[in-house]
């Protein structure tokens, strides 16, 4: 699915298809450094740092979410598709 490349920003969080939350820490020279948490990455705690191309990051996430987002919670409804 993916998000527009121009929507990526430091400090924002994004949700992947499998329920992982990724928080952008740095964008430099077309590379995105992020930390992740959620379904498959470190439970509820922010985990190890990962760096990928901005194109791959934008492709691999579904949408922007609040950084305290919990995919198991009904607190944040799914967007209309």
Which positions does each model-derived feature cover?
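Mixed-charge, Lys/Arg-rich low-complexity intrinsically disordered regions
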Residues: 1-9
């Amino acid at each position: 699915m993916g998000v527009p490349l121009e929507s990526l920003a430091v400090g924002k969080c994004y949700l992947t298809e499998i329920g992982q939350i990724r928080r952008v820490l740095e964008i430099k020279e077309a590379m995105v450094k992020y930390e992740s948490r959620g379904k498959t990455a470190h439970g509820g705690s922010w985990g190890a740092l990962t760096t990928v191309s901005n194109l791959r990051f934008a492709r691999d996430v579904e949408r922007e979410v609040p950084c305290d987002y919990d995919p198991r919670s009904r607190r944040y409804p799914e967007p209309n598709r």
